[in-house]
Amino acid sequence: MGFKSGVVKCFFLSLIILSVGCAELTSLREEKVLMTQRIEELQGENEGLDSKYATSEEENARLIEEKNRLEDAQRSMEERLKGTGVSVKIKEGHISVVLPSSVLFNSGQIKLKKAAKNSLSKVCRILEKDFPNEYIRVEGHTDNDPIKRTKQLYKSNWELSAVRAATVLHYLIDNCHLDPTKLYLAGFGEFQPVASNKNKISKKKNRRVEIVVLTD
C-alpha cells in the first residue's frame, strides 16, 4: 500500500507540475502575442509620426518659398512705383498696393485727382503684367473722424470708404486689361486702422485705398 500510495502521489504531483508548466507556457505565449501587437502598434505610430514630420517639413518649405516669392514681388513693385506716393506691403499672405487718400482725392471728395490717374496707370501696368488672372479686392479705409460736411451724401465712413473704393475699382476696370469678374470692393470705414488716429499724421495714414492681390 505504501508503494502504491507513493506512486499515486508522484503521478498527481507530476500532473500538477505539468499543469502549472502548461499554464505558465500559455501565459508566456499570450504575453508574447500582446508584446508583438504592441510592437506593431508602436511601429505604426512611429510611421505616422514620420509621415507627419515629412508633411510638416514639406509645408514649412512651401511657406518659406511663398514668403520669398511675396517679398520678391513686393521689392519689384516698390521699385517700379517709386515717386508715385504708392507703397506695397504684404498683408495676410497677399500683396497689397497702398494708395493714400491724399494721393487719390481732395479732402472729402470721391473724384480722382489728375496726378492720381498717373499713379494708378502705373499700378495698372503692374497688375496686367504680374497678376493678369488673380482675384483683386479694392478696399476703402478712412480715419475715425465722423462725416460732417458731406453728411447728406455719406451717412458714415463706411459709405465714404466704399464709394472711394468703387472709384478706384472703376478706374481699374476702365483702364486695365483685367477680368472684371475677378474684381470686387470692400468698404471698411475706420475699422481697420494702420495707425492710432491720435493725431493728424496717424489719421492721414489711415485714409487710404488698398488694392489687394489675392494670390493662391
Enumerate the predicted regions with their spans.
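Bacterial N-terminal signal peptides that target proteins for export
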Residues: 1-11
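C-terminal motif of bacterial Sec signal peptides marking the signal peptidase cleavage site
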Residues: 18-21
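Extracellular/lumenal/periplasmic "stalk" regions immediately C-terminal to a signal peptide or transmembrane helix
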Residues: 23-98, 111
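Short, solvent-exposed beta-strand/turn patches at coil↔beta or beta↔helix junctions
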Residues: 64-67, 92-121, 143-155
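Periplasmic peptidoglycan-binding/anchoring modules of Gram-negative envelope and division proteins
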Residues: 74-84, 109-140, 169-173, 211, ...
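Soluble periplasmic/extracytoplasmic beta-strand elements of cell-envelope proteins
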Residues: 87-89, 94-104, 135-139, 167, ...
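Extracellular/periplasmic catalytic domains that process cell-envelope and extracellular macromolecules
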Residues: 88-91, 119, 131, 178, ...
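Periplasmic OmpA-like peptidoglycan-binding domain that tethers envelope proteins to the cell wall
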Residues: 109-114, 142-216
